């Protein structure tokens, strides 16, 4: 099974992806996580350091695939999760989609691409071109990470459009949304009501998740010295269980941008509940309008 994880930049995709990968490994799966971001920090939480990228390795070998061994590009992370970083072209040049293609090509050359039960692609930020949507060409499912804010839901809606487009040519499905760092879910609920899709899980604001990223450790590793974090791990195990159930998934239909703006701004102007909720919604809205 191949899973592509998308979402707005800075939403916590990589931290979420790493914890999901470990959760899947805990369920007995052989897992490979592929970071698809020029920052090449997707797997930092699994390995504790920035591993060499596929592109760096190819360049050092003058693109002679026959001179590259699996151990040159596949690094062992926490919990037995194997890690690969695709890397990216130089800033302002090249195409991220080409890099993803080269990564998959090399893994196939090494007979590694089909050796895993789960391959998880952790993909950079918003989908702005076909190149960044390239991992969807290989995925069975897409998971979108969001929060309860305007920006993240607009990005989710754009990703939804990419899923629909890619699903025309192969059996790609949206498994659902994962809410991250979310104290409320009113905007999420409003969005999925208008654009029906599953909500796999909604994680509350948990400071230890942010701290885990800084430490370069997954929550599963941290729980060894902090047993009180077990409850956080259960969120990720629940997500893993839903993925392993091979959900039917959907081919979503995105909402036109202006309609989405109207939909979410209506909730801002006509909040349900007291002044505290209205203030929180206003903060989300103003954060969007400043962009």
Curated annotation (Swiss-Prot):
Write out the coiled-coil annotation as residue ranges.
none
Which InterPro entries does the record match to this protein? Answer: NifH/chlL_CS, NifH/frxC, P-loop_NTPase, Protochlorophyllide_ATP-bd
A Gene Ontology cellular-component term: chloroplast
Q: Name one GO molecular function term.
A: metal ion binding
Q: Where in the cell is it found?
A: Plastid, Chloroplast
Q: Which cofactors does this protein require?
A: [4Fe-4S] cluster
State which Enzyme Commission number(s) the record gives.
1.3.7.7
Q: Which pathway does the protein contribute to?
A: Porphyrin-containing compound metabolism; chlorophyll biosynthesis (light-independent)
Q: Which residues bind Mg(2+)?
A: 14
Alphabetical keyword list: 4Fe-4S, ATP-binding, Chlorophyll biosynthesis, Chloroplast, Iron, Iron-sulfur, Magnesium, Metal-binding, Nucleotide-binding, Oxidoreductase, Photosynthesis, Plastid
Provide the residue positions that the database annotates as binding ATP. Answer: 10-15, 39, 180-181
What biological-process GO terms show up in the record?
A: light-independent chlorophyll biosynthetic process; photosynthesis, dark reaction
Segments crossing the lipid bilayer: none
Oligomeric form and interacting partners: Homodimer. Protochlorophyllide reductase is composed of three subunits; ChlL, ChlN and ChlB.
Q: What does this protein do?
A: Component of the dark-operative protochlorophyllide reductase (DPOR) that uses Mg-ATP and reduced ferredoxin to reduce ring D of protochlorophyllide (Pchlide) to form chlorophyllide a (Chlide). This reaction is light-independent. The L component serves as a unique electron donor to the NB-component of the complex, and binds Mg-ATP.
For this protein, the record's NCBIfam families field holds: DPOR_bchL
HAMAP family for the chain: ChlL_BchL
Q: What is this protein called?
A: Light-independent protochlorophyllide reductase iron-sulfur ATP-binding protein
Q: Which organism is it from?
A: Pinus koraiensis (Korean pine)
**Upper classification of the organism:** Eukaryota, Viridiplantae, Streptophyta, Embryophyta, Tracheophyta
